[in-house]
Design a protein with these regions (language model features):
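Membrane-cytosol interface segments of multi-pass membrane proteins
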Residues: 1-169, 209-220, 269-272, 277-284, ...
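Active-site environment of divalent metal-dependent phosphoester hydrolases
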Residues: 35-37, 99, 172, 202, ...
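Amphipathic alpha-helical segments that form well-ordered structural scaffolds
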Residues: 142-146, 195-203, 259, 321-324
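Loop-centered beta-sheet repeat module
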Residues: 157-203
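Alpha-helical transmembrane segments and terminal signal-anchor/GPI-anchor hydrophobic tails
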Residues: 182-195, 202-284, 290-311
Length: 335
């Protein structure tokens, strides 16, 4: 009697999107909680920022669904920016205005303050990382429709992420390019996974499957990328360009998503719903947790895990309130 491993259903990427987003958000909070360099958990904690890559991959898949359903630019941009920008404006104002008044140094003039609130321009100009993921995502949205139309008409251009990977190398090692835009390494090194997500969108939409035997390849990919990333952070932290590790994050992201889907299939429904709830308010949680919750909790000098759990417990209700308030206000405006 032969035992066959069930095929891997790519549709689960869509089915468990909420849970995946929730897990990614928890990874990011784990990454932001401080930990001494000599701690044995330091390397694993440092790669929690792979949650950003998971966000971007899932965002790419979701954009493909949206575009193929209704390829209309006005509808596309309205849905995307009405979802992100109001929450961004509220939390950016809540951070940058008091910071400017109190001389915190993030905004040096009223013009600089306006730029930080509207488009977070100090990220683009000086690599100011307070809320970098949100302006980076909004920038990627600008280019997504053109890319999706391009690969629909000319599928060969699905290979463009390879060129994006080459660009990451150029921005690090070609001196004129590095001087011009090298400060945006954290953005450039995340661009490929976003467009890879778009590339995978059609396979997810068509509910394609992978041979069950491929699970062994996925596990090898996961372990190689995970363990090498942990080693780099635990042993070589600060001794290598970060884009190199983020190249490892690409296979780590894809393999993690596929393995997490198998986990979510087996978890009790209440736990899936709880993790999915975190995913549903992940935008707001990202904006709130670090600057408005975590930095105050860390003053209590608690150990790592109590700090993490207290941060989560405080952040989630605040994120839900922001999400509900913004959603209701936007619904009224758009009627």
């Amino acid at each position: 009697m032969s035992w066959k491993i069930p095929d891997i259903e790519l549709a689960n990427i869509s089915k468990y999107r909420g849970e995946l987003m929730g897990a990614a958000m928890l990874f990011i909070i784990l990454f932001h909680v401080g930990l001494p360099r000599e701690d044995l958990f330091f390397g694993l904690r440092r790669i929690g920022n792979v949650g950003v890559d998971i966000f971007l991959f899932l965002s790419g898949v979701g954009l493909w669904f949206s575009w193929t359903k209704r390829p209309d630019l006005q509808h596309f941009f309205a849905n995307r920016y009405w979802r992100v920008y109001p929450a961004w404006l509220i939390m950016a104002s809540a951070f940058y205005i008091p910071d400017y008044i109190n001389g915190g140094g993030h905004s040096t003039s009223l013009v600089d303050l306006a730029g930080d609130i509207l488009i977070n321009w100090d990220f683009w100009l000086h690599d100011e990382l307070t809320f970098w993921y949100i302006p980076a995502t909004m920038m990627l949205y600008l280019f997504a429709p053109a890319y999706m139309q391009l690969i629909i008409r000319h599928p060969v251009y699905r290979w463009l992420p390879v060129i994006m990977l080459m660009w990451c190398i150029l921005t690090q090692y070609v001196t004129p390019i590095h001087h011009a835009v090298g400060h945006l390494e954290i953005f450039w090194s995340r661009v490929p996974i976003f467009f890879i997500g778009i590339n995978c969108g059609e396979m997810v939409r068509r509910k394609q499957t992978m041979d069950g035997a491929s699970i062994w390849m996925i596990i090898v990919m996961f372990l190689m990328s995970l363990l090498s990333s942990i080693f780099l952070e635990q042993v070589k932290h600060g001794e290598f360009p970060l884009f190199l590790e983020r190249m490892l994050y690409i296979p780590l992201t894809v393999s993690s998503i596929l393995l997490l889907n198998r986990l979510f299939r087996r978890l009790p429904s209440w736990l899936n719903k709880a993790i999915s709830f975190v995913g549903g308010v992940s935008l707001e949680a990202y904006l709130i947790h670090s600057q408005f919750v975590l930095k105050y909790i860390e003053r209590w000098n608690l150990s790592y895990w109590p700090t993490f759990f207290i941060c989560v417990v405080i952040t989630l209700p605040l994120a839900w309130l922001l999400h509900e308030g913004v959603t209701r206000a936007v619904d009224k405006i758009r009627r």
